[in-house]
C-alpha cells in the first residue's frame, strides 16, 4: 500500500489527557483507559519505521502530559524519522527544549484566537493563551538562532463562529511562522456533536477567512483544510495503539497495531493518499 508513496506522516495521539477544555475538540479518547508504556511505544515506532513512513507527529490530548514523549521523539529521530509535535504550548519549557529540541524538526502550536477572552470562551486556556503562544514561538526562534536548533514553527487554528472575522496576517509574519494550518470546525459524532451547532460556520465564512489571508496563502504559509479535506486523509493512532479514521463524521478503529501489524491494521481503517496530497500533507522538512 505504501509503495511509491512519499513523505507520509503518521499522527500518534499518544496521550489522552489534556489540561485545556476546548469545546470543539475531536480527540477526547474517553473510551480509552491507558496509554502505551515506553516499551510498547518503542515497538510502535519500530512498526512505523518499517513501513516507509517519513514523519511521526506526536499529538494528544496534550502530548507533553506524557512522561515518555521526549524519549519517544528521541528514539524516532534515531530511527531516521522526521519528527514533529503539536502542543498547546503551556508545558513546553526552555529546559525541555534544551533536552529534546535537537530531536525535533517541527513544533506546531494550537491557537485559535488572537483575543484571550475568545480563547477562554471556547476552552483554549485560561486567559493568557496568546501570550503563551507568542512566547513559545519567540523561544523557538531564539534557540534556532543561538543554540543550534533547526525547528520549523507551525500554527494550527480552527475557524469557528467565535473567530472567523479575525485577521492573523501580522501575527503570523511577526512570529516567523513557517506553516499555518487553518481548519474549518469539524463535526465528529460522539466527540463534539453536542456543541457543534453553536460553533459551526458556513463555507462562505470559512473562505472569507482564507481570502483575508491570501498573502500568506500566496507565500505558501497558509494551508487550509475544509471538512472534505479531513476525511480519510490522515493516518492517526490512538493512545492505546490502534489506527483510527474520520469516515462520514465518525471514527472507525482498527485492531491493535502491535497485535496484527501496521499493514493489516491500516487496511481496517483505510487511508486516501490522493486526499492527503490534495490537502498539502505531502511536504518536506
What is the predicted role of each segment?
Residues 2-84, 91-98:
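Conserved alpha-helical substructure of the radical SAM core
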Residues 9-11, 55-57, 82-84, 106-108, ...:
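Structural preference for beta-strand elements that scaffold enzyme active sites
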Residues 50, 78, 101-102, 148, ...:
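Residues at the C-terminal ends
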Residues 72-73, 98-105, 123-124, 196-197:
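Short low-complexity, flexible loop/linker segments enriched in glycine and/or proline
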Residues 116-285:
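Radical SAM enzyme [4Fe-4S]-AdoMet core and its adjacent flexible, acidic
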